[in-house]
């Protein structure tokens, strides 16, 4: 508790000292600025001192030269802007044109959507006209014609002759099999009849 008054006094003294220092520095700055403004001389006054008495024409010449210089500076500063602005506009137009060309859609998707009946549409830029890629079995400008398969006569003739030969061979084989079975049966019957006749003869002789 005893330290608090001493700390407060120290802070108060430090604040007073800083206020005094800042006030002195501000006064010094003000004095320096006042001295500088009093020593400065305007350029018109210096030129007036250099010019002889009665030199009004010289002043007019200097004023005209300064005005010409100002005009030249203004023209020089404005010309690059005039040259630069058209180039930017032209670049923007070119970019827009390029974007427009890239966004062009295929005419086959809209205008010639139903041009090809049995095929796919393809737009030829060189001819500026659509063309069709026909599906297999169709032909024509719009793939509207159906192409029928053409049979070869020689091929059909060979096919029929082969079928006829096969039929004849199969029929002949069947006939041979049937004849063989009949002959086998006939021979078997003949042997059976001979045996029966012999048995009959033996029975007759035995009865006697």
UniProtKB/Swiss-Prot annotation:
Instruction: Name the glycosylated positions.
Output: 85
Q: What functional role does this protein have?
A: Growth factor that mediates its effects via EGFR, ERBB2 and ERBB4. Required for normal cardiac valve formation and normal heart function. Promotes smooth muscle cell proliferation. May be involved in macrophage-mediated cellular proliferation. It is mitogenic for fibroblasts, but not endothelial cells. It is able to bind EGF receptor/EGFR with higher affinity than EGF itself and is a far more potent mitogen for smooth muscle cells than EGF. Also acts as a diphtheria toxin receptor.
* Propeptide boundaries: 24-62, 149-208
GO MF term (any one): heparin binding
Question: Which SUPFAM superfamilies would you find in this protein's record?
Answer: EGF/Laminin (SSF57196)
Organism (species) = Sus scrofa (Pig)
Q: How is it modified after translation?
A: O-glycosylated.
Specify where the region named Disordered lies, as residue ranges: 37-57, 81-104
Topology Extracellular: residue spans: 24-161
- What is the protein's name according to its record? Proheparin-binding EGF-like growth factor
Q: Which InterPro entries match?
A: EGF-like_dom
Cytoplasmic topological domain: 183-208
GO BP term, example: positive regulation of phosphatidylinositol 3-kinase/protein kinase B signal transduction
Would you say which domain of life the source belongs to? Eukaryota
